[in-house]
Amino acid sequence: TLDYLQSLYEKKLCTYPRTDSRYLTSDMAEGLPVLVNLVANAMPFRKGIAISCDEAQVINDKKVTDHHAVIPTRNLQNADLSGLPVGERMILELVALRLLCAVAEPHTYSETAVTVECAGAEFTTKGKTVERPGWRALDAAYRSALKNAEPDKENEDKILPELSEGQTLPISNAAVKEGKTSPPKHFTEDTLLSAMETAGKEDMPEDAERKGLGTPATRAGILEK
């Protein structure tokens, strides 16, 4: 991933890649709406989705150390993305998605919790109703555009019918299932990088300049050794 980002940086299609910052600096706020609109027009997955830009969500000088977050550059406007290697194009689209989602409208929904009693035992379920898709519309469009993309079951909304307090419901079926808990998953290169980034987080003061093991520029090299 870092190699792809480095190549995109050398082609002037994205900013400096060796950073773990998630924020931009205040001097970038004025030009951000133009950049967001340009990036959105260059990305095929955003067709038909309205784009907004709330700069306040990503501008924070205090949370930027040496370099701001990785974002696409204005050179996308005249770039032929179809000519990029597949890996570079996919990484560039992912960087663009993260920027567009970060400044998009919030995803808003209402949640309903239902508790039912049966044979003296209580059972609870929850369901969501989306009010405004917000940034999730972009995320869903990006995922659906990927070939062989697995459905995002973790964020799949469970829709409940209209219910009222004290209502009696028929039981369609019931079953007792036995199972075993799963052991923690083995570390992968991706989860190791994340663990290095947050190592010792609980023991560090809030205003610490750096946290974790290594830096964005050295963590991948440490794992390779």
Predicted features along the sequence, with ranges:
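Core catalytic DNA strand-manipulation module of type IA topoisomerases
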Residues: 1-225
